[in-house]
């Protein structure tokens, strides 16, 4: 059985592996496709930049699992993705959110860590 960290790494590796959908009703004369980013593992359209930031931070040695606390000011999607991946990979995360943030988004962030 794989470790939790190994499973988390597999989740992060799947970021960007999202479906393409042809928009044939909107553009009948041209082949136009949309990439469905909300199908990323975190459910956030900001999964790519969030996973990139964590990956680059680890490569540079600025982030160390189980030692580093990630701090992010967020108003939504980036925080959702960062909290999902950071928690999965063993980072503590603290988020600064605006008062006007929806209760639903606050609940997602609390659930993620």
Q: What positions do the PLM features span?
A:
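PLP-dependent amino-acid enzyme catalytic core
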Residues: 1-113
């Amino acid at each position: 059985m794989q470790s939790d960290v190994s499973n988390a790494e597999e989740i992060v590796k799947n970021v960007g592996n999202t479906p393409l959908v042809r928009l044939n009703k909107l553009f009948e004369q041209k082949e136009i496709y949309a990439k469905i980013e909300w199908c990323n593992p975190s459910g956030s359209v900001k999964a790519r930049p969030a996973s990139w930031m964590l990956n680059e931070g680890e490569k540079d040695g600025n982030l160390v699992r189980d030692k580093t606390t990630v701090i992010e000011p967020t108003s939504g999607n980036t925080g959702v993705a960062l909290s999902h991946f950071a928690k999965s990979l063993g980072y503590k995360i603290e988020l600064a959110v605006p008062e006007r943030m929806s209760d639903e988004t606050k609940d997602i962030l609390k659930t993620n860590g």
